[in-house]
């Protein structure tokens, strides 16, 4: 990923260049057709295979094209962490959809050397359960989105995400953490960015 918007949560890859980059993230104005749909027709989201865009009030508009480009147009007075949150999760998920890559809405830990995914609706406790396993010394693989593929033995594997979780204030407090030690990731929902560098496994793991 090559991004004009700093995504401090992601692992830096010094070998990315214009020849091998998969996704380019740019910041700028939306195409006129999207502006018209958004501003005149009050449309907040659009999906048509190779083109996906969505609008988040007080945050910005995101346009994902052909699984290669993400264009972000911030709203005036936006909060950077909110802007970044919708880029990391919803926009990247749209790219995976366009690439026809199987992605599960869930979080994954490693149990008995296999990846276990906790999945469910938003707010069902996926990240909370994952954080509890992390606290009990289990290794961490991915939060919110689990990207699946098939290895050379035709076995499903879970690919690593990045070394961070997004947790709610009550979850952090319930697990005995001090919220003041973490950065707010999405201020409107009081979500905090929680590093997982010591628990993170940056290699694909077979699905349990």
Which sequence ranges carry the predicted segments?
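Glycine-rich, often acidic-flanked micro-motifs
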Residues: 1-14, 107, 111-121, 135-208
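Post-Walker A alpha-helix
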Residues: 129-130
């Amino acid at each position: 990923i090559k991004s004009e918007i700093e995504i401090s949560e992601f692992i830096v890859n010094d070998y990315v260049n214009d020849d091998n980059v998969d996704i380019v993230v740019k910041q700028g104005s939306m195409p006129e057709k999207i502006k018209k749909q958004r501003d005149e027709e009050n449309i907040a989201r659009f999906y048509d295979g190779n083109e996906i865009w969505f609008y988040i009030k007080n945050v910005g508009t995101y346009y994902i094209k052909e699984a290669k480009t993400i264009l972000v147009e911030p709203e005036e007075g936006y909060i950077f962490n909110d802007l970044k949150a919708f880029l990391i999760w919803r926009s990247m998920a749209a790219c995976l959809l366009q690439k026809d890559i199987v992605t599960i809405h869930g979080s994954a830990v490693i149990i008995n050397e296999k990846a276990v995914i906790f999945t469910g609706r938003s707010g069902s406790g996926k990240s909370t359960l994952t954080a509890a396993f992390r606290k009990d010394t289990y290794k961490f693989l991915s939060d919110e989105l689990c990207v699946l593929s098939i290895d050379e033995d035709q076995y499903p594997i879970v690919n690593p995400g990045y070394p961070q979780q997004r947790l709610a204030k009550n979850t952090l407090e319930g697990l005995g953490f001090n919220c003041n030690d973490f950065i707010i990731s999405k201020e409107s929902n009081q979500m905090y960015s929680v590093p997982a560098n010591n628990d993170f496994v940056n290699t694909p793991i077979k699905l349990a």
